């Protein structure tokens, strides 16, 4: 059964035991999966990679049938999944799981994907596509962020930030965090320093990049 990404607040894990999130928009997937988890904080969270499950399917089976006084209710997240996981999902479907919920996190799945088709046709399981964000959505997210943090930026700077995010809110949030760190000491965002800020390498901690690299560059100008 297909539902829209904005409908995740309607998900009831007691009824919808297995959910597929798929798509290229990693930021949206993370956000929506977090929403589901936060609505079920009483459940124990377990994370696996598809390779782990394929190498040892008993990982999932044991979690389904093993009961503990402390973690009867569980949410199992299986990441980086492909069509290879389908047989295990079909096996799980044959068992009536009660206290376990499973979230499947996949990258983009083509229409011919057997995994996607299985979830789309199912009456019991949910399928939530997470398509790339458009410019309008990213602009709203960025504006809301700056408004909440009370950071003043021009429309031109806002456009610059959004344009480099490749239609993915995860990229946007990374850039917004850089800016938040930068202005924490009373520094102002300008056309000149925003280009330096958003082009900093991603393989360092954001705070380290902003506080060290950018600060040094600005002192030289």
Spans of model-derived segments:
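Conserved beta/loop motifs at nucleotide-recognition and modification sites
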Residues: 1-220
